Each structure stands twice: as structure tokens, then as C-alpha cells.
């Protein structure tokens, strides 16, 4: 039997023996009001997808069809999305996407206290019901394409008990990640979580090796280390801060370079992975998609990114004036109506209306937004269902924008939400729950 056939058979067996846990309970506080009413993984991305669709699509494309989604903060819109768009796996074949919500009590004692605790609190159902041999743990809030079966194969081949996905990042950004050092066999020799002075890769003084928040564990080893960790004083119940250091101390921790399993390389061979955890990074990652050859190819059918297909009418474009520049370098989703308006370098989600003589430039406009006549929107993120009145100007005078809206830390991006606009218009702002 050839090596390629043996490898494919090994991968097939590995994925069948693996349970995926997607940690999707995070708020994403650096996104401010954009995640006030939705968890970060449920945030819209790329015109008609959600952030969690990337992790889920990677699973399906990798042959991993036994998936648990661990939820906590503002989970309603996420749960609706999963029920409407991800309920196609045949459970009679042992395939599923199950929701694992935090079982909060009145005293808050059973909220997930950290990433490791989120797995620990579900350990009984994992061990007794799902019974996996391997557990793949993913963050539900990153944008990337990866073949997880290759990571599983590397995990088994190295005789690791725990394997962490890693990626090279600029050293000045590495303080936001767990940073590691490895030997020639990719065995992790040092690991520090979010260091102030990140260590560099040997012979690459400006680059560090960072954790992607992706882990493969032998299931029995994970049960054991979680049981030991829960009784440890002063623990933060976190994989990066508590579990990985234990695995490092026990010399069973290995690294898997993302370059070995990345499925999203651009034409220059560069790998693509983004943490869209700030307003600037969320805006930039969406705007990047409008270029002719974006780093992330959302049209690649060899590794499709699935989602919840909404039933909308086709978009309509009315141009009755000769001096109006048509839509230019933009993504326009279904059900949009553009009337004598200029749209350039922008992403419009479903059912956006832009009225006459308005200009939308370098902006990300979420679903069901209405933009009135003679408006100028530049470098904006417009949240869902916002109504922009006629003659509104945003993104031209940053100091005026600071008084009315949320301006990003770099001063480049302006976030506009429904409550901000109502307050500006003198309307009473009440707490509302939207079916997002």
C-alpha cells in the first residue's frame, strides 16, 4: 500500500476518533458596542458570513463532523445562526454540531471561568457521551483556512500529549499572544503567555512564534490535567496560562506550524490568519476583501466557507444621473438597493439601502442599514439596522465624530450603532433585544 493511501486512511481514522470543541463564548470587549448584543464569533464578516463560519467550515472541510460549540456571553444570535445554517449533519451517522452553553446559576458560580474551565465543566458529557480519543480545541473568533486533519496527523506522529498550533508574528505584536520556543523536532522548550518582552525566533530578531489558540489533546491526558488543574490554588482556568505550562513541564508539548496545514495562501504564497479583535482589525480584514486579489479568497470552492444562506431578492442599482460614479471595488450582498449613490471600496451586507447623492467609501455596512440622501460615510463600521438620516456626514471631521460615535484607538475607524444614532436624534434609548 502506498504512503499516500496509508496517510489518507490514517487521517480518516483520526478525524473519526476526534471531537472538536469550538470556544465561542467570548465577548470581544475591544470591539466595544459592536459586541454589546452578540458574542464575537457571531459577528458578521465578509458580506454574508459570521466569524464562526470559518472554524466550522474548516472542520467540515477537514472531515471533522463531531463538533461541540461552547457558548456563554450573548449567545442568542449565535445559537440562531447555528440552528438555521449548520443543522445539516446526519446525526444517525454520529455526526453533529451540538451547543454546550454555560449552566449559570443564581450565584454565577457555574459561568465558565476561563477557557480550560469551559472544557472542564463539559468533561462528563465529553467523556461519557462523545467518548473521543482526541480532542481538538479551537477559538471561534479567528479568520483563516486550515486543514485540521494535518495537525492531527502531526500530533500522533510526534507522540505528543498536547500539540499547539503556532504562527510567526511580528515581535511588536507578540505581546497579545502566548509565545513559545521550539527545538528542531518542534518540541516546545519554553512558553510564556502574553509577555511584555516577547522572545524572538533564533536568526529572526523581529519575529516571534505565537500560539493560535488551537490545541490537540489526547483525550485521557486532557481529562487528567484538567482534574489536576481545577484543584490548583490561584489558577486562572486558562489553557495558555495554566494548562500549556503543565504540558511543557511534563515534556509532552509540541508545536504545529500553521504553514503545514494552511489552506488560505495568497498568490505570493503568504499564509492568512487574522484575529479581528479590534475595530481597526475588523474593518481592515473586511476592506481587504474588495481588492482584485485579496489575501483571503472567499470564492475558493476547493475550501468553501459555508454559512447561513439568507433568502433575499437580488440587489438593485438605479443610476439616473450621468455624473454619478457607479459601484467601484466593493462587495454588495443580496437584497441591497442602491439609488444614484456612489459606493467605493466598501462591503455592504444583506438588505442595505443607499439613497440618492450619498457617498459610501471604505466602509463596512452590516445588514438592514438605511443610508439617507446626500450622506457621506468614510472609514465607517455601521452596525445592523442603523438608519442614517439625510445629509449626515461621518468620517470627514474626526473630532466631531468623537463627540457622536465610537472612534477606534488609531483614530481611523468610526463605529456607528443604532443607540448612538437614536441618542444623536434625541430619541429615547431603551435596551432592546434584536434577533440578530
UniProtKB/Swiss-Prot annotation:
PROSITE patterns: ADP_GLC_PYROPHOSPH_1, ADP_GLC_PYROPHOSPH_2, ADP_GLC_PYROPHOSPH_3. It catalyses: alpha-D-glucose 1-phosphate + ATP + H(+) = ADP-alpha-D-glucose + diphosphate. GO terms for molecular function: ATP binding; glucose-1-phosphate adenylyltransferase activity. The keyword Transferase applies. Alpha-D-glucose 1-phosphate binds at residues 112, 178, 193-194, 211. It comes from the Bacteria. Keywords: ATP-binding, Carbohydrate metabolism, Glycogen biosynthesis, Glycogen metabolism, Nucleotide-binding, Nucleotidyltransferase, Transferase. Homotetramer. This is Glucose-1-phosphate adenylyltransferase.
Amino acid at each position: 500500500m502506498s504512503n499516500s493511501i496509508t496517510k489518507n486512511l490514517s487521517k480518516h481514522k483520526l478525524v473519526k476518533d476526534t471531537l472538536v470543541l469550538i470556544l465561542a463564548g467570548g465577548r470581544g470587549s475591544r470591539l466595544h458596542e459592536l459586541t454589546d448584543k452578540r458574542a464575537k464569533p457571531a459577528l458578521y464578516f465578509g458580506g454574508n458570513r459570521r466569524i464562526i463560519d470559518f472554524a466550522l467550515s474548516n472542520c467540515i472541510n477537514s472531515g471533522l463532523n463531531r463538533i461541540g460549540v461552547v457558548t456563554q456571553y450573548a449567545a442568542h444570535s449565535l445559537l440562531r445562526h447555528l440552528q438555521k445554517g449548520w443543522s445539516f449533519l446526519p446525526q444517525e451517522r454520529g455526526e453533529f454540531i451540538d451547543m454546550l452553553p454555560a449552566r449559570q446559576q443564581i450565584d454565577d458560580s457555574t459561568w465558565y471561568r476561563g477557557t480550560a474551565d469551559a472544557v472542564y465543566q463539559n468533561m462528563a458529557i465529553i467523556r461519557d457521551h462523545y467518548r473521543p480519543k482526541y480532542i481538538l480545541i479551537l477559538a471561534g473568533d479567528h479568520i483563516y483556512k486550515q486543514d485540521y486533519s494535518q495537525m492531527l496527523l502531526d500530533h500522533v506522529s510526534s507522540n505528543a500529549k498536547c500539540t499547539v498550533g503556532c504562527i510567526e508574528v511580528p515581535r511588536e505584536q507578540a505581546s497579545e499572544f502566548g509565545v513559545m520556543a521550539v527545538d528542531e523536532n518542534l518540541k516546545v522548550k519554553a512558553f510564556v503567555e502574553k509577555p511584555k518582552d516577547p522572545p524572538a525566533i533564533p536568526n529572526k530578531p523581529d519575529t516571534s512564534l505565537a500560539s493560535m489558540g488551537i490545541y490537540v489533546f489526547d483525550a485521557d491526558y486532557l481529562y487528567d490535567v484538567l482534574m489536576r488543574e481545577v484543584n490548583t490554588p490561584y489558577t486562572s482556568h486558562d489553557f495558555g496560562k495554566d494548562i500549556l505550562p503543565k504540558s511543557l513541564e511534563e515534556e509532552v508539548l509540541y508545536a504545529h506550524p500553521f504553514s503545514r496545514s494552511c489552506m488560505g495562501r495568497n498568490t505570493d504564497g503568504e499564509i492568512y490568519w487574522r484575529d479581528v479583535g479590534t475595530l481597526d482589525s475588523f474593518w481592515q480584514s473586511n476592506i481587504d476583501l474588495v481588492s482584485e486579489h485579496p489575501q483571503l479568497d472567499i470564492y475558493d470552492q476547493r475550501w468553501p466557507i459555508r454559512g447561513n444562506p439568507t433568502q433575499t431578492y437580488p440587489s438593485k442599482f438605479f443610476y439616473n444621473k450621468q455624473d454619478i460614479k457607479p459601484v467601484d471595488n466593493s462587495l454588495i450582498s443580496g437584497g441591497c438597493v442602491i439609488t444614484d449613490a456612489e459606493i467605493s471600496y466598501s462591503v455592504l451586507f444583506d438588505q442595505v439601502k443607499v439613497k440618492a447623492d450619498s457617498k459610501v467609501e471604505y466602509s463596512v455596512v452590516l445588514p438592514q442599514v438605511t443610508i439617507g440622501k446626500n450622506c457621506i460615510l468614510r472609514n465607517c463600521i455601521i452596525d445592523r439596522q442603523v438608519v442614517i438620516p439625510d445629509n449626515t456626514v461621518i468620517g470627514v471631521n474626526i473630532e466631531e465624530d468623537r463627540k457622536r460615535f465610537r472612534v477606534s484607538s488609531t483614530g481611523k475607524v468610526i463605529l456607528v450603532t443604532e443607540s448612538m444614532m437614536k441618542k444623536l436624534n434625541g430619541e429615547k434609548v431603551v435596551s432592546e433585544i434584536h434577533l440578530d
